[in-house]
Structure formats: C-alpha cells, structure tokens
C-alpha cells in the first residue's frame, strides 16, 4: 500500500459537521485495510485568497496508508460533498507520523504562555510574602 497526505477544506458554515466527516472518511480508509498515521484538525483558518466568495475554511490534514481504491473512493466523496470546498491528495514516500509544523508552533505558543503564567504567579506569590 502507498502513503498519502490528504488535506481538505470544509465550508466554514459546516464546521459542526467536520467530526462526522472525519469519522466517515477514516472509517472508509480502515474498512479498506488502510491505516491512519496522522490526523490533525486545524480548525477554521483564513484563506490565502477567496474561494467561492469565502475568506475562511475549516482545514483537516490526514496522513494515511491505503490502497488506491480507498483513495479513489475518498476523492469521489470529496467531489460530491458540497461542504468540501477544496481537497488535495498527495502520494508520499514514507509514513509521516510527527506533528505538522502548524501544530508544533501552536504547542510551543501554548507552552510559552503556560510558562509565562507560571512565572507571573510565582512573582506575585513572592511579592505577597515580602509584605
């Protein structure tokens, strides 16, 4: 089986349907004896340029190992689902399991924010004990 990276963008008004869509698409891949190596829901993000007069979309990234028939079925589902405004399926040489750069940056920002909050809490406690 081959490895694929799949990104699809969902209409922002249909964001509440994304978990069901992810479940349906991952179910189709696993039913065809495929495996999902990475699944990231990037959420609603700004588009680089308007698509169908939309400026935002809900992004989902999947890295899978699946037979060609499962990928063909997935592309057909993307094509006939009106909520999916764009999709891209790329074949990759190896399975990608590490977090994407977007998720890594998000985690780093969260860690920095938590560290800063802990430092300010420690500083305020130290200031209270001096009085």
From Swiss-Prot:
Basic and acidic residues bias (residue ranges): 104-116
GO cellular component: cytosolic small ribosomal subunit
Stretches the record annotates as Disordered: 98-131
Keyword rRNA-binding applies: yes
Entry keyword rRNA processing: no
GO molecular function: small ribosomal subunit rRNA binding; structural constituent of ribosome
Similarity comment: family membership: Belongs to the bacterial ribosomal protein bS6 family.
Function: Binds together with bS18 to 16S ribosomal RNA.
UniProt-recorded name of the protein: Small ribosomal subunit protein bS6
């Amino acid at each position: 089986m081959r490895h694929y990276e799949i990104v699809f963008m969902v209409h922002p008004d249909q964001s509440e349907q994304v978990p069901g869509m992810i479940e349906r698409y991952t179910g189709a891949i696993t039913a065809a004896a495929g495996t999902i190596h990475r699944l990231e829901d990037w959420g609603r993000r700004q588009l680089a340029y308007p698509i169908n007069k939309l400026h935002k979309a809900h992004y989902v990234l999947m890295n899978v190992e699946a037979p060609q028939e499962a990928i063909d079925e997935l592309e057909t589902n993307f094509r006939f689902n009106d909520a999916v405004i764009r999709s891209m399926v790329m074949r990759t040489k190896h399975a990608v399991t590490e977090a994407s750069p977007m998720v890594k940056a998000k985690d780093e920002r969260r860690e920095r924010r938590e560290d800063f909050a802990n430092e300010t809490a420690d500083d305020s406690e130290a200031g209270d004990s001096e009085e």
